[in-house]
Amino acid sequence: MVYILELKTTQAAAMKIVTDAINSLLTDANFDFYPYYIEEGEESDDESKNSDTDNDYESESDDADSDSSNEDSDSEQYIKKKITKKNSKANAKSKPNKNSDKPEEKAGEEKKKTIGGVVLKEVNKTGKILVYMRLDADKFDVYKYNYHKKKLTLGIDIGNLLKCLKCMSHFDTMSWLVDDEDINKLIVVLESVERKEKKTFKLNLMDIEEETYDITPIQFPYSITLPSPDFHKYCKDMAGSTDKIEIKATSKKLFFSGKGEIGNVEFEVGETNGGLQIVSTTSNTNEIVQGLFELKFLLIFTKCTNLCNQVTLFLKNDYPIIVTYQIAALGEIKLVLSPSKAD
C-alpha cells in the first residue's frame, strides 16, 4: 500500500469547527493539495495550459484583498469564473511519485520556494459568497505528498466529511490519506493514544467540475481587527432587530446599524487595548467606508468564532466584505460576502 497523500494533525478540533462552518455554505467542494514546497514559476505538466490553478496556493496565500460576488451584483467585474473539463477523480487517476515524499533541497539551488499545503476556493450556490481556506503544509504534524503532478484535486462532500469529524473526541489526532490503489476514496482516521482508539472512515470522492476564479487584488482602506467573540455578539444582537446590517468604519471607530420592525438600531465601537484595532492602509485617514450585508450569512461566518481570538475584516465602499479567521495554527479561512441592495 502506497499513499499518494498523507497528512496528520493534532488540531482536529479546529478542523471540525471550520468544516461545520463550510458545511453551512457549501454542499461539496474541490480540495486542492499541493506539494510540501512549491518553487516559484513552477508549472504543472498539462494543467498549466488550461488554468492558473498551479499558482493558486502561492498567490492566494499572500493576497488579503481578494473578493467575490455574484454575476448580478455591482461588483461582478472583480471576479470571473472559468470551468474546466477536468473532474476531481480524473485528476487523481495517475501513478504516484514514490520519490517525492518531501522535496529535498539541492545544493546551490536558487529557485525561491514557498510552503505548499491545502486550498479550498469555491463560490456557494447563491453566488454571493466566496469561501477560501488555506492550510499550510509545514503546520501539519505530517504532510507527505507523493503524487507525480503539481496538484491533486479531491472532490469532497462536506456533509459527509463533517459526519466523520463529529465522531472525534477533543484531543484526537486526525489523518487524511489517499491510497494509490483506491484513489476514489479519502481515508479519514481519528486516533486517541490515551484511549487506544482508532476510527477509520473511507469517504467516496465526488466528480465535481473543476472551477477556477480570477480574482482582482484590491487595496482596502482599513484592516479592522476585533475579538472574534465580540463580532459574534454584535451580529447575534443585531439579528433580533434586522435582516440586513450596515457596517461602517472610520479610522477610529466601527459602526453596526440596521432597520427593522422595532425601528433603527446602531452599535458604536471604539478602539481599545485588546479590543478593536483599525489600521489604515492608505494615506487618507479621513475616509469613511461602509457596506450593507445580509446578516444571516455573517452569522454563519461566526461559526468560526472558536477558531481564534480575533477576527479581521476588510471593508471598502461598494465592495464585498472579507471576514478572516485563523484556523488554530494550521492556516486561515476567508469568507467573502457581496454587498446587499437596500430594500
Regions found by a protein language model. Give the residues of each.
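DNA polymerase sliding clamps and clamp-related checkpoint/processivity subunits
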Residues: 1-241, 246-343
